[in-house]
């Protein structure tokens, strides 16, 4: 019996050590609030996984179809039209582009597609940003914006994505 208890104690101790030695993945969240008179809102979580960042969440209240989705340079959504968020996050001074273009703004995520009920499920991976405040690609303290219209993935500097339907600070 003592031997069984000893083995169980060692097993629990090893399990506890393994659990505490695992490094947690950096995460951040943006809570999107309506802007420009829209009803668009939602929550997006950012999770750093190695060199990529996974965006996951749900956004509601938009019209059906694709809508521009970008990280903006300033973490300020105070303006009623979210113009206080500045332009697209662009630390490397690239041209506007699509999410898979080799040269683009770091904040060019592409389009979200909203269904008939006005809901978009977010499940995107991005490779040119980091969930941190440090370094040129850090996104904490910046803004996440959903636009009124589709991003054409080419027109500089905005992709003709229209007004800003929702904005949230990444933190």
Where are these regions (language model features)?
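Bacterial N-terminal signal peptides
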Residues: 6-15
């Amino acid at each position: 019996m003592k031997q069984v208890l000893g083995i169980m104690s060692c097993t629990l101790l090893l399990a506890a050590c393994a659990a505490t030695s695992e490094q947690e993945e950096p995460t951040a969240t943006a809570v999107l609030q309506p802007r420009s008179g829209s009803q668009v809102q939602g929550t997006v979580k950012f999770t750093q996984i190695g060199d990529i960042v996974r965006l996951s969440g749900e956004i509601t209240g938009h019209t059906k179809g694709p809508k521009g989705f970008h990280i903006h340079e300033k973490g300020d959504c105070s303006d009623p039209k979210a113009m206080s968020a500045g332009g697209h996050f662009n630390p490397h001074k690239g041209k506007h582009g699509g999410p898979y273009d080799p040269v683009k703004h770091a904040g060019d995520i592409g389009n979200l597609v909203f269904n008939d009920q006005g809901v978009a499920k977010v499940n995107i991976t991005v490779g040119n940003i980091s969930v941190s405040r440090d370094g040129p690609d850090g996104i904490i303290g910046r803004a996440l914006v959903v636009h009124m219209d589709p991003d054409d993935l080419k027109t500089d500097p905005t992709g003709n994505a229209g007004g800003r339907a929702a904005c949230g600070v990444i933190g």
